[in-house]
Design a protein with these regions (language model features):
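Substrate-binding N-lobe of the ribokinase-like
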Residues: 28-86
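Short beta-strand scaffold segments in enzyme catalytic cores
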Residues: 45, 90-92, 226-230
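Positively charged, low-complexity intrinsically disordered leader regions
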Residues: 1-24
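Short beta-strands and strand-loop turn motifs
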Residues: 102-104, 129-136, 164, 182-185
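Conserved phosphate-binding/catalytic loop of the ribokinase/pfkB sugar-kinase fold
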Residues: 92-128
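C-terminal domain-closing interface element
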Residues: 93-95, 99, 274, 295-318
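Conserved phosphate/ATP/ADP-binding segment of small-molecule kinases
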Residues: 145-233
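Conserved post-catalytic alpha-helical subdomain immediately downstream of the catalytic base
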Residues: 213-224, 239-303
Length: 318
């Protein structure tokens, strides 16, 4: 197995921990944590910590943050030099409630040719890739069909790809038939105009989207309410598990790493896919800042329920 991730808009997550946020007032900071981040980077780190070989295709700004990170972590990366500094994202984490408020920069504007450079770099490593993971925002200047073009490249090499994005990046990317998509609750609503819910009606609407685009799996991370996995045949729901939440921004990316691992292992059972992914997410929640699941994630237990199946719940019964 060998994984490839793409990070077109890396960042530094500056997590500021406070007891609670009271708008218009001053606050005493409990702790500040800085992590080099980005969806692809985070998935690469999680898979590396799970003992998997990963190639990270990542933009590298003039400030050298990307180069320093991959050297420090001793991770394999194809770095594409670009001008400017990496963007800074501010994360206000309330330790009393576990709630996080985010302020994310857009990133340095770049030319479309840089997007073409990324696509060429990915094509070079696809012959040895088991699963390609695409996700996150793109910098100003990149086309909305960026993930679609990468997905078409993956198709040429018969490489399954996972897409974790939102808006036009997700809508366009779905046309290349990813094996799995994983928007979170907010991203799903922003993209499809429907609030995710743990109901058969929602699963039916999600199932229709998957079938129209030949997508095998559609996940939705629901934060403290758990997670859903929908296929054309069935749907599974994972209950939230009580954990000591110290950081939330790495959980979704850890979940993607779990899906990627299971898919590379040729797991096709929805309940096992979701259990693996949720286990990774739970482990990340117990770490402060933007940190990924360690190997011990596999020891976590997830309570899963078959929410719907083709026998109990099919399109013809709606």
């Amino acid at each position: 197995m060998h994984f490839t991730t793409v990070t077109a808009n890396p960042c530094i997550d500056r997590t500021i921990q406070v007891d609670s946020v009271n708008l218009g007032h001053s606050h005493r900071i409990q702790k500040t944590i800085c992590d080099f981040s980005g969806k692809g980077i985070n998935v690469s780190l999680a898979l590396t910590q799970l003992g998997m070989p990963v190639k990270s295709v990542c933009l590298s700004h003039s400030d050298g943050e990307a180069a320093n990170f991959f050297k420090q972590k001793d991770m394999d990366a194809e770095l594409i030099p670009v001008p400017g500094n990496v963007r800074i994202n501010i994360k206000l984490f309330e330790t009393s409630t576990g709630c996080m408020t985010e302020f994310n920069e857009k990133g340095t504007p770049l030319e479309r040719e840089t997007a073409a450079d990324v696509i060429r770099a990915v094509k070079n490593v696809l012959p040895t890739t088991s699963v390609l993971i695409l996700g996150g925002s793109v910098p100003p200047g990149f086309p909305d069909d960026f993930y679609y073009e990468l997905g078409k490249c993956a198709q040429e090499y018969d490489v399954p790809f996972i897409l974790d994005a939102s808006g036009s990046l997700l809508v366009n990317g779905m046309e290349a038939a990813p094996v799995l998509i994983k928007p979170n609750e907010e991203e799903y609503y922003a993209t499809f105009g429907v609030h995710p819910s743990i109901t058969q009606e929602f699963c039916a609407s999600y199932r229709q989207i998957l079938m129209e685009h030949n997508i095998a799996y559609g996940a939705v991370s629901l934060g403290e309410k758990g997670a859903l996995l929908v296929t054309p045949e069935a749907a599974w729901y994972s209950e939230p598990v009580s954990v000591d939440v110290k950081g939330v921004q790495g959980a979704g990316d850890s979940m993607v790493s779990g899906f990627a691992y299971a898919i590379a292992k040729q797991c096709t059972q929805g309940d096992q896919l979701l259990k693996t992914a949720v286990s990774c997410a739970h482990a990340s929640l117990e770490l402060p800042g933007t940190q990924m699941c360690p190997w011990q994630a596999w020891k976590k237990d997830s309570r899963l329920h078959l929410l719907s199946s083709s026998v109990r719940f099919s399109m013809g019964q709606i």
